[in-house]
Amino acid sequence: MTIFRRHYHRVLLVLLLCLCSAGVSAQGIAKGADVSWLNQQAASTPPQVFRDAAGNTTDFIKLFKDVGGNAIRLRVWVNPAGGWNDGRDTLDKAKRAAAQGMRIMMDFHYSDSWADPGKQTKPAAWAGHSVTQLNTDVYSHIQGILQYLKDNGITVSWVQVGNEINSGMLWNEGKTPNFATLGQFINSGYNATKAVYPNAKVVVHLANGYDNANFRWFFDNLRSAGGKWDVIGMSHYPPVGSWQDYNNRLETNMRDMITRYGSDVVISEVGMDWQQAATTRAMLTNLLSRSNAIGSRVLGVFYWEPNAYPGWQGYTLGAVNNNGQLTEALQAF
């Protein structure tokens, strides 16, 4: 009887492990979208609404799910004008995403507005703070927002500690090439994330995913400074006429980041001209094929604001028409 029980327990353990593995692999690559503008669009005059192919008004996240989307990315600002992308606005969108079964990525900008390679302006409330204080600011901000989400039933899978930080963050203290301080800021965000969501993966995100030399320079220096990360994030906005070349260069960079640093990678942002939907679909199909060929270290591809009406906020790389219907671009998902 004892031998039988041992054998039974071994078989049961193997079956459970297989089921767990199947559950993980079943999630597959994240086919995502940053939809942070949604509530602001709904509050515009007239409100921007979304329609299915039959012309019926519906929720954009449901439209996205219906074409194969399975993940949502949301940016967070510190004290934004109008409240867009603050904690409450973010929670509302996160709840809508969770209701559709989406995995969620949070994108912390450490600013009251846009942060990108050309500007990394500190939040007004943090101006004049020392490096020690800024580290506390970063930790408290991320820990506070994430705990707020968790307390409201939201599971976060990935957390970006900064947005397109090729030139650093929280200028001037964290501006490159001051990697000693920049590494501290990144680690403060990393530690805050793990304190709330131990299993969430922390992303360090740069623009121009095709630029392998810049990625090597940045992550070599960050590693030397003791910076911590789980995932290297990349933005990818290829020109319509040469997207094949840019996809080639992006793949080369992804493979190198995986090999050089033992890191997962994710395409945090991608987009192309909304009027070139067929070409965008081809580009995305190719990008997903390359990502799947690389393997499980490529975690996902996130289209940036596909919900943007043409020209909304000056952005023309969305994936809906002027009637709020999806173009064919996202059929790649």
What are these model-derived regions, one by one?
Residues 1-12:
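Bacterial N-terminal signal peptides that target proteins for export
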Residues 10-21:
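Bacterial N-terminal signal peptides
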Residues 22-26:
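Sec/Tat signal peptide C-region and signal peptidase I cleavage site
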Residues 27, 59-68, 92-103, 147-154, ...:
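Acidic (Asp/Glu)-rich catalytic clusters
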Residues 31-33, 72-74, 104-108, 157-161, ...:
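Hydrophobic faces of well-ordered beta-strands that scaffold small-molecule active sites
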Residues 86-89, 116-229, 240-252, 260, ...:
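Active-site cleft segment of glycoside hydrolase catalytic domains centered on the general acid/base Glu
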